[in-house]
Amino acid sequence: MAVLLQLTVAPGTQDQFNELDAKVGQSMSEAGGPPAGLMSHAVYPEGDGFVIAEVWRAEEEGQRYMGDVLRPLLAELGLTGQDNVVRPVWSFARP
């Protein structure tokens, strides 16, 4: 079942997110493309940080990516992500 994974990073600025985004892009380029199972990705500001919101085909794929790739990149930048919030996705549509 598809899931929405949300990771809140706080504190975190837009400049820090931009650095993270560049590192994630480099990682994806080295891996030959986006991670398997990623269906959509969005980031929005919240409070003194930002939230990474992604829809994954399966929770295990998203948790593995966050643990193996995203959290280490956050740590490289001195950022901390809170516990993932996981929600089931009942419907997903692409235009």
Task: Tell where the protein language model's regions lie, with residue ranges.
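Short S/T/G/P-rich N-terminal loop/turn motif that feeds into the first structured element of a domain
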Residues: 1-71, 79-95
